[in-house]
Amino acid sequence: MVVFLLAASAFGFFVAANFKEHLSIGATAYEGTCRAVTLSEANRTKHYQRVLTRFSDGKKVMLYLPLSGECPQIGDTLQLPRATIVPTERQSQASYRHFLMSKGACGVCYPYTYRLYKAQHSTSVRRFALSVRDRLLRRVDSLIESEQSRAIIYSVCFGYRNESREVADKFRTVGAAHIMAVSGLHLGIVVYFVWFLLAPLISSARQRRWLSIVVIAVAWIFALLTGLSTPTIRAAFMLTLYEIADVWGVSRDRINVLAFSAFVLLAIHPGFLFDIGFQLSYMAILSIALFYPLFYKTGRARLRKNPLISYLYGLVALSISAQVLTIPLILYHFGSTSLWALWSNIPLVILSGALIPLVLITVLFIPSGVLFSTLGAVIAWLCNVILEVIESFLQMGGGMLRVHITLGGMMALYLMVAALYQAVLILHHRVDGYEALYGSEKRLKESIRVPRNFMKPAYLDGLTSGSQPPLSIK
């Protein structure tokens, strides 16, 4: 693990140095009229509409448009009277610089006015995905009346986060902000639901291959329904590699698949290295792959007799293992983390696991009518339970740990965790070896039962008295 961390760090520093040099530009001023094509959907903040664009000279620039203007979509053209670009490297906050680098933006611009030209015939797959998501959101509007419940469904099920910021702040305070952002967790819930329905029907290796194809198709359909967000594409790509390796009979080692998928994505777009979501998602998966077997194995033997307690212990082990390697990264980027994250994630993940499949089935396959309204009432009840769970943790108070660490401090923490992991791994191997030896010796003694009337040969009596055995036995 230490070698893996050092190799990953060296590769990361190499990519970061080359990508920063690629984005480095001086302050640029466009005096005349300039045009920019939108590359992302507009994200509405308190004061601006934030949208990533590409100028006519090929530069990617993050525009902050006034809220009073029309909301642009992917593929639309913005005409600006004049624009001054502030370079990315001149941004004072390191986290904001990393955010711009993750998008490939070389600078920021704040135009006071603009003219919008809608795209007539857009061939963008992302724009098509967003239009599909918008139609599903309109069905949610007809299904749920409460604004807070709609905000939860928008974020948890479809990755649309331009609604209630109050709900998002509550999730963030209890350490469950990742549930509000569609990612690998949500795709995993959908895929597991499909697998749970179809796995009992599988009885041969050929059917298992067809199940892998269905799982891959469901993963990419879910990515399409959520607007082809980057975290969902990342998770679908990783799942695709894992299932292809299974179909072809190749080793499905999670760390190998994880490393290969990260290498491919960074080769396509090196800016992902600066994306906090990219860092957290890969670090969480690596943490689960390394620590979940240790945590779960420790208590599984003792809790095997009670399936319910064993299942709950598995959730606790999963929650703990996912946070071992993500906490140093969170402290480095944000300087704080929630102490309730360990416990709040268990009920919230369970409730989300029921909410996401139910919402998708309702809005995709159930026509308007009595059943549609009944399922809407069940969905609204689940959203209310989620809000009550969050409120119960908020009422406890004092759940924030505020510690800001530097890059060197973060690397030191990871080296300490790596050393501790190696020590625990060695201890587990020694304990397992002792138990295997002791268990085999005990089974050997129980399997060999000497009869009471057993007569030993004479030369064995001689051995017990200290004499040498004869050279030949007649």
Identify the function of each model-found stretch:
Residues 95, 151-154, 168-169, 359-362, ...:
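Short coil/turn segments at secondary-structure boundaries
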Residues 40-120:
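OB-fold single-stranded nucleic acid-binding module
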Residues 228-418, 422-434:
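Internal transmembrane alpha-helical bundles of multi-pass membrane proteins
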Residues 50-51, 89-90, 105, 186-189, ...:
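Short hydrophobic/aromatic residue motifs in ordered secondary structure
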Residues 33-38, 48-49, 54-58, 64-78, ...:
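Non-globular, low-confidence helical/coil segments that flank catalytic cores
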Residues 106-238, 243-244:
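Aromatic-rich juxtamembrane segments at the membrane interface
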Residues 1-27, 108, 124, 128, ...:
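N-terminal leader/targeting segments
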